Amino acid sequence: MTIGVCVDSAFSGRNDAALIKITNSNYSMSDVVNVSNHTLSNDKYMLVSEGSTIYKVGSTSGYRSGTVTSTNGSVTYRINNQPLTISNVLVTDAMNLGGDSGGIVYCKSGSNYYAIGTASGSKHSTNNLTEDTFIECYVSQMIYAIQPLDCSYLPLS
C-alpha cells in the first residue's frame, strides 16, 4: 500500500531521513507501533547506555537482540565516490543483513518498550552476518508525525 510521496530527504553528517506527505486518505496515522508482539508508543523514548540490551526487526534477518557497545559511534559511507561520515550513532552487536536498514530498533524498561532508532548500516561481515550494526538514534533529533503534515511549504529537491 502506498501511503504518500517523499517530499524531501537528507543524507548528511548528522541526518539520514526522509519526509513523507501522506496522500492516501485510507491510511490512518497512529502513535502506536506493533513490533514482534511488543507495542511501542511513539510518545515514549529512552536514552540507552553501553551494555543495554536492544531489539531490532530487519526485513531480511527478522527479529534480533543485541547489546549496545558504543553510544557515540560514527560510520563512513561512500556517496558518489566521496566519503560521508554519519556521527551520533549507537553501535550494537545485533546482527544485520542487507535489506535490514530502516528496521525499528527498541529497548525495554520494566514492562514498557521504547523506540530508540532505526538500523542504518554495518561494519564487518562474518558468514553473511555483520558484527556491528549502526543505529540511527532518535535521541537528539526525535520528531514524530502524529497528525498528517502540510508539506506544501517545503522545497522539493
Regions found by a protein language model. Give the residues of each.
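Serine endopeptidase catalytic core focused on the charge-relay Asp
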Residues: 1-80, 107-109, 120, 139, ...
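Short, surface-exposed beta-strand/loop "edge" segments at domain boundaries and coil↔beta transitions
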Residues: 27-30, 97-101, 126
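Conserved catalytic-core subdomain
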Residues: 87-90, 118-157
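Helical hairpin unit composed of two closely spaced alpha helices linked by a short loop
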Residues: 66-96, 101-102
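Catalytic nucleophile loop of clan PA
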Residues: 94-118
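A sequence-level detector of short linear motifs
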Residues: 55, 85, 115-117
